[in-house]
């Protein structure tokens, strides 16, 4: 059962790096004979942080810049996909998702909001998401500078 929040875009998730390999498959079976499971880059990052690095969910969520609840959903989705692929003998492809590599955003850009229409910049107010702000110049919605919505690296499904 899919829990898609209709009408609400996925928030940008921070990842340390992109996967070193693009796919895993059962040995001795041609890839074109296998069903494929797509594990998104942010799901793989959640597995890395929680299962490989041993972070608690709250710490891992902070590193990915998502809520603890969102991190839990990402991790649960990844666990189900990976377990299903292992049990049913499917190949896993690591691709897609809404993410940004942590190194792609500078510290000075994290405290700025930018207009998605005219490019006007304003200081980010703590506790107020940029997307909740409107541009004082043209009235359009603002996005976090350096975030996925501001035209930086964005890999979508």
Curated annotation (Swiss-Prot):
Q: Which domain of life is it from?
A: Bacteria
Question: Sorted alphabetically, which SUPFAM superfamilies does this protein's record hold?
Answer: Sigma3 and sigma4 domains of RNA polymerase sigma factors (SSF88659)
An example Pfam family from this entry, by short name, is DUF134
Name the PANTHER family on file.
Answer: PTHR37478, UPF0251 PROTEIN TK0562
Q: Which family, according to the similarity comment?
A: Belongs to the UPF0251 family.
Can you name this protein?
A: UPF0251 protein Cphamn1_1487
Organism whose genome encodes this protein: Chlorobium phaeobacteroides (strain BS1)
